[in-house]
Amino acid sequence: MNIFRLTGDLSHLAAIIILLLKIWKSRSCAGISGKSQILFALVFTTRYLDLLTSFISLYNTCMKVIYIGCAYATVYLIYAKFRATYDGNHDTFRAEFLVVPVGGLAFLVNHDFSPLEILWTFSIYLESVAILPQLFMISKTGEAETITTHYLFCLGVYRALYLFNWIWRFYFEGFFDMIAIVAGVVQTILYCDFFYLYVTKVLKGKKLSLPA
């Protein structure tokens, strides 16, 4: 494992912990897109089905279990425990417009036409756009809480670091996965505007708000 993957995993884990703590400590899921969290739960479920068929390492297994468990815990907090605070009026992105095309693409473009491989490919494609409902929600409300922006920043850093991980693996291991790289580039591009606002506003102590 190289440093880019390790720090990417830690950044991803930090994002998940930040989100869970934000919801639990504030007893509110205001400003959080439940639809994005459902999509992430679907991403981890379809990607890590290999937990049932193979063992790579203790680290790998633990991280997969943590991701799946935290994803469903987040969905539970939003749609059950703190449902009264969920802002469904602004969380209106049509998630099916992401899931259906991504599902079709996974069938057409994959490494191997087998159930597990198609589901893994589906998860890679879906993860690249799963944050769109959250970004759409922020665009509708015009602002985001600081802790929510920290969560999004850590997610963006995780994906950017994974791009460097693929570059490292190509040069030092001769490993190249076009599907993962293209999806990672798409996901990183989606965060670009947010990164700019994060650096110019949030890091300077200002609240992230979008122009009217």
UniProtKB/Swiss-Prot annotation:
Q: Which GO terms describe its biological process?
A: protein retention in ER lumen; protein transport; retrograde vesicle-mediated transport, Golgi to endoplasmic reticulum
Q: Which residues cross the membrane?
A: 5-24, 33-52, 59-79, 93-110, 117-135, 150-168, 179-199
Q: Which family does it belong to?
A: Belongs to the ERD2 family.
This chain belongs to the protein called ER lumen protein-retaining receptor 2
**Taxonomy, superkingdom:** Eukaryota
| Region listing for Interaction with the K-D-E-L motif on target proteins, in residue ranges | 47-48, 159-169
Task: Fill in the domain comment.
Answer: Binds the C-terminal sequence motif K-D-E-L in a hydrophilic cavity between the transmembrane domains. This triggers a conformation change that exposes a Lys-rich patch on the cytosolic surface of the protein. This patch mediates recycling from the Golgi to the endoplasmic reticulum, probably via COPI vesicles.
Entry keyword Membrane: yes
Q: Which residues lie on this side of the membrane: Lumenal?
A: 1-4, 53-58, 111-116, 169-178
Q: What does this protein do?
A: Receptor for the C-terminal sequence motif K-D-E-L that is present on endoplasmic reticulum resident proteins and that mediates their recycling from the Golgi back to the endoplasmic reticulum. Binding is pH dependent, and is optimal at pH 5-5.4.
Where does the entry annotate site (Interaction with the K-D-E-L motif on target proteins)? R5, S54, E117
Query: What Gene Ontology molecular function terms does this protein carry?
Result: ER retention sequence binding; KDEL sequence binding
